[in-house]
Amino acid sequence: MEFDFDWVDAFTDQVFGGNGCAVVHGGAVLPDAICTAYVRETSLVECTFTGPSEIADFKVKYYLASREIPFAGHPTIATVAALRHRGLIGEGPLRLETGAGIVEIEVRGAQIAMTQIAPVFGVEVPVDLVADVGGLEPGDIIGQPQVVSTGLPFCI
């Protein structure tokens, strides 16, 4: 099997700037082991694999070097930019099927606007633990740290 791919720098107009992402067109059919191996080979943080969808315009699968993840922001922008560059989409609304649900996109010229997936709020994290990890004093932290995810969970 052969697949076309694009190496996209999202959030920049500079070559070798921004957030890199490889977009493998038609690759959503590949097994997880191949997708994760591909990410490792590229040395990128995330890569996307597109395919047809019965419920949206395209299906997008997101992978780290170790596993599939439900969604990620900059790879979504990179994927849409690659689809646009190849002439696979035009201007206007676009719906992507992701592991986290349907993502609404609006394409206007070179601008890509994405409606972020609603956050999922996880466990609260002790202030002293976050302070220790960040080399801070507990009093330096304003508010209660909590794990929040719109695709990948982070403590904020």
Task: Please tell me what each predicted stretch does.
Residues 1-71, 77-156:
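Active-site proximal loop and beta-alpha junction motif in alpha/beta enzyme cores
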